Structures are given as C-alpha cells and as structure tokens.
Amino acid sequence: MLYSKKKEFVKFLEGIYKNANTIVAIHYHGLTVAQLTQIRKDLRVSGARLKIVKNTLAKIAVANLKIKQADIFSGPIAIAYSEDYITVPKVILRFADQYPSLKVVGGFVDQKVATMNDIEQLASLATSESHKGNFLSLLQIPIRRFATVSHAPLVKLVTILKNYVNNKS
C-alpha cells in the first residue's frame, strides 16, 4: 500500500473511531469469504459496517486520537462499527456462536476500551425498536379498554332484545 493511501486509511479509521459509538474487533481467520459476506450483509441491514484493517494502521489511528489502547490489534483483525450501541454486539455475537473460528477480541464504546464482558452486556440489551414496540403497545391499552367498555352496553342491549323477541314468540 502506498504511503499516501496509508495516510488516507488512517484518517478513515480516525473518523470511524470518532463517529462510531460501538466498535467490535474480531479475528476472522478461518472464515470463508461467503461467511464474511453474510456478516457484512447482516451488519449493513442494521446500519453497521465491517472493515478489515491493517493492525499497524489501526494502532496509529487509535494513538492519534489518544484513546487508551488495548492489545486487540494482532492477527487478522476486522472491525464492526455503528452509531448504535446494541446492533454490532448483537450481530457479531450471534455469528460468533454460529462460526467457532470467529473470535471477538474486544472493542471500543464511546472511545473507551471495551472488554468482552462489556460487549456481551450490550448484546443482551433490547434494541430501540423493541422498546418502541413495547411503548406503543402500552399506549394502546387504554384505547382497547375504552373500546371494550363502550362496546359492552351495545352487546347487552342486543342480548336483551334477542331474549325479548324469543320470549314473545
């Protein structure tokens, strides 16, 4: 890689480290191209990205931003990143269960080093979509109760009229 390209890539990585709220570093050695492509697709659907990085350039980018560095940049490393806190850990840990050769080595949350335990805790949280769904269902409860209560007198009236008609006949 040319020196100018390396400088561009370091700037690109610095942008990722600044803008992404969650970054998960993985060892991808042993994964097929199809498996990596599937991980990328699943991440892309949820608004996240996967980038294979050169360790030296990743270390330089982290050092330039004065982020405390963990020893995660060794071997074949890819970083999955997103502005969402929960998406990346959920997708990556799901694939780590599915593909034993994929190893999560650490990451960064809000430009601070995250351990495997931190990443697992983030993955166990509910997504914002599920929170929105729960909130909307809570909003519907009073409306449903009102509909049921207002519908009950009509049902009773119809039942009384049916009984009256049946008794007359």
Curated annotation (Swiss-Prot):
GO terms for MF: large ribosomal subunit rRNA binding; structural constituent of ribosome
Keywords: Ribonucleoprotein, Ribosomal protein, RNA-binding, rRNA-binding
GO cellular component, as recorded: large ribosomal subunit
Subunit-structure text: Part of the ribosomal stalk of the 50S ribosomal subunit. The N-terminus interacts with L11 and the large rRNA to form the base of the stalk. The C-terminus forms an elongated spine to which L12 dimers bind in a sequential fashion forming a multimeric L10(L12)X complex.
Name the record gives this protein: Large ribosomal subunit protein uL10
Domain of life: Bacteria
GO biological process: translation
Protein family per UniProt: Belongs to the universal ribosomal protein uL10 family.
CDD domains: Ribosomal_L10 (cd05797)
Naturally occurring in which organism (per UniProt): Orientia tsutsugamushi (strain Boryong) (Rickettsia tsutsugamushi)
